[in-house]
Structure formats: structure tokens, C-alpha cells
Curated annotation (Swiss-Prot):
It comes from Psychrobacter arcticus (strain DSM 17307 / VKM B-2377 / 273-4). Residues 113-158 are annotated as: Disordered. This is UPF0145 protein Psyc_1853. Residues 113-122 have a biased composition (Polar residues). InterPro entries: UPF0145_dom_sf, UPF0145_YbjQ-like. Pfam families: YbjQ_1. Belongs to the UPF0145 family.
Amino acid sequence: MTVQLSNLEHLPNYQITERLDVVYGSTVRSKHVGKDLFAGLKNIVGGELTAYTELLEESRQEAIDRMIVKAEALGADAVVGLRFSTSSIAQGASELFVYGTAVKAVPMQQQPIYQSSNQPPSHHSGHSQYEEPVPSAAQPSTTAQANDDLPRFNPFGE
């Protein structure tokens, strides 16, 4: 089973059917003394500290892997609201912590563009999250040119 990850509170093109629990993964890593000395020299002259970049990437992947194991144990299809946090634990050691909400999710059904009669669907045939709202008579028009001669307030002063 592949657990999908999303930093959003939802999973695009999926419907969340159940929120299971908060899941997390963490790892604590320390810097290698030799690499730390080299990084100190590199810090003086400038440039990327590749030893730290690699350490952070390895830490991030380890924390994600640990979180996924916990999500799989819950039977989750995805983890949403994914967040990372780092903190200094001791001199030269840091923790990388990742967490999110394990969820059950199913793919959304694609809405047909046209009904079988080859006519556009009416506004009452279903609701799409991307459907433009239809202005009612009670709502003022937001178009640039109004159909009447009433003065209009323009907050931009134009």
C-alpha cells in the first residue's frame, strides 16, 4: 500500500472519508566532527554546506519513513496537513520531526462535462467545487459597467 502525502488539509482529487489519527516520525542526528570542521571553513568563504544539506535530506527521509509506517499500521490511504519541525536537542545534535493527520480517502468521481443528451448540464444537476456561482437578482453586479446610472463606489479611486 502506498500512503500519499499532502501538505494541504485535503488530498487533491480524493474525498476524505475518515480521519484516523495524528501520525508522526522523528529522528535525532548529530554532525560528524570532521564534516563540521570543513563546514566551519566553508562558512567563512561562503557557499552551500553540502554536508549539512545531505544530513538534513537523510533526516527528512528517515522521519517521513517512520511516519508512513505508523500511518500504514492505522490502514491510512494518505497523510494530510504534513508539517516539518526542527529543534536543537544538545550541542551538535538536532531533531527533525514530521507530523500530519492519517486519513482514509477515495478517488473523486469525475463529473461529465455534458449529459448523454449532448446538452450542457443545468445548474441544478450537481455541485462542483469549481462551479462559478450564479449571481441572483438580490446580489449586486460586480461588472465594470453597470446597466443603470447609479453612482458606484470604487475603492481604488478610478
